[in-house]
Amino acid sequence: MGRSLKKGPYVDKKLLNKIKEMNESGKKKVIKTWSRDSTIFPEMVGHTIAVHDGQKHVPVYITEDMVGHKLGEFAPTRKFRGHGAHTERSTALK
């Protein structure tokens, strides 16, 4: 279930202010954020945002296709290590 349309999309105010300052000055540098729940706005396109995944900040380059999605969708919090392998040792135990 999505967010109510009357409320509008959520974006962290500090993050949006940093993006606006960078757009005005023309500078491009990595912005660190812990706000995984912020919606990606069109003003963010072309910037690199380091999104926290619980351990480190994952750099995410924002493209036009990402607009409307959340920042946390592009920084996975879990690492999939694969399912159990069929090895000689595991089959010998049966």
Swiss-Prot record:
Family from the record: Belongs to the universal ribosomal protein uS19 family.
PANTHER family, A to Z: RIBOSOMAL PROTEIN S19P FAMILY MEMBER (PTHR11880), SMALL RIBOSOMAL SUBUNIT PROTEIN US19M (PTHR11880:SF8)
NCBIfam families linked: rpsS_bact (TIGR01050)
Organism: Halothermothrix orenii (strain H 168 / OCM 544 / DSM 9562)
Biological role stated in the UniProt entry: Protein S19 forms a complex with S13 that binds strongly to the 16S ribosomal RNA.
GO terms for cellular component: cytoplasm; small ribosomal subunit
Gene: rpsS
This protein's record includes keyword ATP-binding: no
Record keyword RNA-binding present: yes
Coiled-coil ranges per UniProt: none
Keyword set, alphabetical order: Ribonucleoprotein, Ribosomal protein, RNA-binding, rRNA-binding
UniProt protein name: Small ribosomal subunit protein uS19
GO MF annotations in UniProt: rRNA binding; structural constituent of ribosome
Gene Ontology biological-process entries: ribosomal small subunit assembly; translation
